[in-house]
Amino acid sequence: MTQFDVTDTPSESELAAISEGLTAFNTTDVGPSRRRPLAVLIRDESGKTIGGVSGYTAWGWLFTAWLFVPETLRGQGMAGKLLEAAEAEAEARGCQGAWIDTFNPQALRAYQRQGYAVFGELPDFPAGRSRFFLQKKLSPR
């Protein structure tokens, strides 16, 4: 008999079963994702990573999962420079678009300055804020 097991401590193999199953389904449904990690790192004088942007490209799109600029570098256009570098690599990989989400008002404005447009909003995530989903058209090379 099929059963559900609710847990906050799934094993790596349990998570892999879900991921591998969905990946196989999606590959059959729409073709391989050709998913590749993408990161643009900010390093200090000693070479230590202190910030940057990370995400991946898949199905012709760049998804930015994380973008962090250290406080000492904020207000200098760093977020835009990071996005431009990630977008250039995504275009070189043949991507036609990019998407990102945020619930931070300053980040929202920064992304909009870079040409991203809101295509969705999730109100009260987190409470008192909205989570915005943004996209931008890229020019694949």
Q: Each PLM stretch: what is its role?
A:
Residues 2-65, 70, 105, 124, ...:
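Acetyl-CoA-dependent GNAT
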Residues 18, 111, 116:
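Conserved active-site tyrosine of GNAT-family acetyltransferases
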Residues 73-74, 97:
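Acidic/histidine-enriched, beta-strand-rich ligand/metal-binding domains
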Residues 75-88, 113:
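Conserved acetyl-CoA-binding loop-helix of GNAT-fold acetyltransferases
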Residues 90-103:
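Conserved GNAT acetyl-CoA-binding A-motif
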Residues 99-101, 117-133:
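Conserved catalytic-core motifs of GNAT/GCN5-like acyltransferases
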